[in-house]
Amino acid sequence: MTNNDILIRLRYAFDIKNTEMVKIFNLGGMDYTKEEVLNMLIKVNDDEEAPEEYIKCNDKMLEGFLNGFITFKRGPQKPKPGQPEGPPAVSGKESPNNMLLKKVKIALALTSEEMLDILYDGGVSVSKGELGAILRNPSHRNYKECGDRFVRNFLRGLTYKYRD
């Protein structure tokens, strides 16, 4: 699952408009025009070649979008003295799938129980311990990398919960 697929599915799950997508990227510190964002949202199958205007979303772009999504959903946060302006950058060790789960959890202020319900709605049954392992810091000894199937089902569960 590519980062572009994640953007497309998040946009669908929360029914985010094109102008809101641009605003979310801007809130995350990324400056893109409406046309550039639309070019990121082009659906490309594995067996076909991407159109010339297609923009591949890298991990930094996805992280910027997710940081903007947190601000979009929760509002801007005033930094305390000595605290950095924005959210800390994710280390290169963390997979984009784990980053997605953590940042969506923060943006929607979800509890672990609510995340388990969303995953169940998406067709995955996991324990609280497994979810905790996915949400841990990559340097923790019990950290578990999140797979594409898990994220796909999480996004499906979000669609069921927030789209209907």
Q: PLM ranges: what are they?
A:
Residues 49-78, 143-158:
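Charged low-complexity interaction tracts in eukaryotic proteins
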Residues 12-25, 64-73, 112-119, 153-162:
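Extracellular/lumenal glycan-associated surfaces
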Residues 1-14, 95-107:
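Short, amphipathic alpha-helical "recognition" segments used to contact nucleic acids or chromatin
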Residues 1-8, 16-57, 84-86, 118, ...:
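A cross-kingdom feature marking solvent-exposed beta-strand/loop segments within repeated
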